[in-house]
Regions:
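Conserved histidines in hydrophobic membrane contexts and catalytic metal-binding motifs
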Residues: 1-266
Length: 266
C-alpha cells in the first residue's frame, strides 16, 4: 500500500523505456564509427615491436598494443604495467599538437555540413554525463546546420571524438535509455552515487515484490478454505489478484537482476 503507488509508476517507466531500448539505445560515437574515419593502414616501412619497445622507458614491457592511422599519421598506442604511450610509427615524427586547426579537421571528418556554432563546455551535459570526461575539459561541442541537427563533442586534450548525436537519437534516448538507466546528468556524473541510487531503488522494489507475492499467496490459501480461487468475487478484482501474483514473480526477477548488474558482490 505504501510502496506500490510510487513504485508502480517507476516500474511502468522502466518497462516502457526498456521496450524503446530494444530499438534505440543511448547515442554514442562507437568504435565502428571511429574506425570508419581512419586512414587505411599501410604495412610498408612499419617498425617491429622490438623497435617500438626500445622507445619506451626502461624496464617497461608492452602488455597491449593498438595500431591505427588517422589524419595522415600512423601511431602505436601502447599500454604497459606502468602507463600508456602514443608512439608515432615514424621515429622522425612527433605527435600532433591538439590545436583549433586539428579540432576542425576532426570535425570535418565526421560531418561536412556547415557549422551553426561551437560551444566550449566546462560542465557536462545530458549527452556526455560521465564524470571521467571532466578530464577532457574544455570540450568542444559542434552544432551542424544539417536537417538531422547533428551535434559532435571533441576533447580539447586528446582531439578524440567523445559523442555524436542527431535529433532522432536524442529524442529516443529521452524515451528509452535516459529514464531506463537513470541517466540524468546531475546523478550520472557521480558514478558511485548513481550506482547506489539504482541498487537501492531495485532493492526496495524487490522487498515490495516479495511482500506482494507473499500476501497474494496467503490470500489464495485463505480462499481455498472456502473452495474459491480468489477471495475477491468481482471479476476485475479476482483477475487483478491472480495476474498480480504471476506478474509479481516476473517483476521480482526484473528488479533483482537490475540490482545485481550494478551491486558489488564477491
Amino acid at each position: 500500500r505504501i510502496l506500490g503507488p510510487a513504485f508502480s509508476i517507476l516500474f511502468l517507466v522502466w518497462f516502457l523505456s526498456g521496450l524503446v531500448m530494444i530499438y534505440h539505445t543511448f547515442p554514442r560515437a562507437d568504435r565502428a564509427d571511429k574506425r570508419a574515419k581512419m586512414d587505411i593502414l599501410s604495412l610498408e616501412n612499419l617498425p617491429s615491436l622490438d623497435q617500438i619497445e626500445k622507445r619506451l622507458p626502461q624496464n617497461e614491457r608492452i602488455s597491449h598494443v593498438t595500431l591505427n592511422s588517422y589524419l595522415g599519421q600512423t601511431v602505436f598506442h601502447i599500454r604497459t604495467e606502468k602507463g600508456s604511450y602514443d608512439i608515432p610509427a615514424d621515429s622522425t615524427e612527433r605527435l600532433p599538437v591538439i590545436d583549433w586547426n586539428r579540432i576542425q579537421r576532426v570535425a570535418s571528418q565526421w560531418n561536412t555540413s556547415s557549422i551553426a556554432k561551437v560551444d566550449s563546455l566546462y560542465t557536462l551535459d545530458q549527452w556526455i554525463p560521465f564524470g571521467r570526461l571532466k578530464e577532457e575539459f574544455p570540450i568542444y561541442k559542434f552544432h551542424f546546420a544539417d536537417p538531422e541537427r547533428h551535434e559532435l563533442y571533441i576533447s580539447s586534450k586528446s582531439g578524440e571524438v567523445l559523442q555524436y548525436t542527431d535529433k532522432n537519437s536524442r529524442f529516443w534516448a529521452w524515451l528509452g535509455a535516459i529514464p531506463h538507466w537513470v541517466y540524468f546528468t546531475s546523478l550520472r556524473q557521480d558514478a558511485e552515487l548513481w550506482i547506489k541510487v539504482v541498487v537501492w531503488l531495485s532493492g526496495i522494489g524487490c522487498v515490495m515484490c516479495i511482500a506482494g507475492i507473499y500476501l497474494g499467496i496467503r490470500d489464495f490459501r485463505l480462499a481455498r478454505r472456502r473452495h474459491l480461487i480468489s477471495p475477491y468475487k468481482k471479476f476485475w478484482y479476482k483477475w487483478h489478484h491472480i495476474l498480480g501474483v504471476l506478474f509479481g514473480l516476473f517483476v521480482l526477477t526484473f528488479c533483482f537482476s537490475g540490482m545485481m548488474s550494478l551491486a558489488r558482490v564477491q
